[in-house]
């Protein structure tokens, strides 16, 4: 359940940079048959060159589509012309002009992306608040002082977990529109983690049930990922989790032996 843990911007950026070409290639149309491939390429170098170009082209195509979402529409023909001219060493722009143009473009993309993120965050915050207020009116639902909204489906038995305990859970996580972003049931494997090692909404929420218990958590963004969001979870998203607490493993008690050894050492000095 990596969605519940912190995701750094650097890690996210690296993941996109390293895996984008492979992902785009996977989204491509059905590949040519083996016979067609053999006819099209004389050797592996030709085939590799073509594969590299195809992967680059799909990456660029995807980039153009993403920029269109920001209101930026680049001329695809000019993009292709720029690539061809660069290979022919006949660029219409000097190196300095290219650098200045790309710097200005980068600033434009960042500005547009920031504006879109702020708009999306505001929209998500308003919709999330409305959803939480509606859910809070349902039977058996409680709202804590932090804003966490929850419904205990089954209380469970034993002691409630503490921050330092390790819990084992099954769960399903969705956005308020029902879009699923995480599910241990479909993976066929429950998740084990220290209770204070996840988002605050989970740390607080699971203390309301015991082993064998089930709970529905509706978590406001300030107890989840806030304005930043993470991949798959937009900024200021209210998150909905159905959680089953399978087991609670208390934190191991501190070993008393080191303390005894320390006392013995002090006695020896005296």
Swiss-Prot record:
InterPro entries: PPIase_dom_sf, PPIase_FKBP_dom, PPIase_FKBP_N, PPIase_FKBP_N_sf
Name of the protein described by the UniProt record: FKBP-type peptidyl-prolyl cis-trans isomerase FkpA
EC numbers for this chain: 5.2.1.8
Record's catalysed reaction(s): [protein]-peptidylproline (omega=180) = [protein]-peptidylproline (omega=0)
Coiled coil location: none
Compartmental location: Periplasm
GO BP: protein folding
Sequence ranges assigned to domain PPIase FKBP-type in this UniProt record: 164-249
Gene: fkpA
Similarity field: Belongs to the FKBP-type PPIase family.
Function: PPIases accelerate the folding of proteins. It catalyzes the cis-trans isomerization of proline imidic peptide bonds in oligopeptides.
One GO CC term, this protein: periplasmic space
Signal peptide start and end residues: 1-25
Annotated keywords: Isomerase, Periplasm, Rotamase, Signal
GO molecular function terms noted in the UniProt entry: peptidyl-prolyl cis-trans isomerase activity
């Amino acid at each position: 359940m990596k969605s519940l843990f912190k995701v750094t911007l650097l890690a996210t950026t690296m993941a996109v940079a390293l895996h984008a070409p492979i992902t785009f290639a996977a989204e491509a149309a059905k590949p040519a048959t083996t016979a067609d491939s053999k006819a099209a390429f004389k050797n592996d170098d030709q085939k590799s060159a073509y594969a590299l170009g195809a992967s680059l082209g799909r990456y660029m195509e995807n980039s153009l589509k993403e920029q269109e979402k920001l209101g930026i529409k680049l001329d695809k023909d000019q993009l292709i012309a720029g690539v061809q001219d660069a290979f022919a060493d006949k660029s219409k722009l000097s190196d300095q002009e290219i650098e200045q143009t790309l710097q200005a473009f980068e600033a434009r993309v960042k500005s547009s992306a920031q504006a879109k993120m702020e708009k999306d965050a505001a929209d998500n915050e308003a919709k999330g608040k409305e959803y939480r207020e509606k859910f809070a009116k349902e039977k058996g639902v409680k709202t804590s002082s932090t804003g966490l909204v929850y419904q205990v489906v089954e209380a469970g038995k034993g002691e409630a977990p503490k921050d330092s305990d390790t819990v084992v859970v099954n769960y399903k996580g969705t956005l308020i529109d029902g879009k699923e972003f995480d599910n241990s049931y479909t993976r066929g494997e429950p998740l084990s983690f220290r209770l204070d090692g996840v988002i605050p909404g989970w740390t607080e929420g699971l203390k309301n049930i015991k082993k064998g218990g089930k709970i529905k958590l509706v978590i406001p963004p300030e107890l989840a990922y806030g304005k930043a969001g993470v991949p798959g979870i937009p900024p200021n998203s209210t998150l909905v989790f159905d959680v089953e607490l399978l087991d609670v493993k208390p934190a191991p008690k501190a070993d008393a032996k080191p303390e005894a050894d320390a006392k013995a050492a002090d006695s020896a000095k005296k």
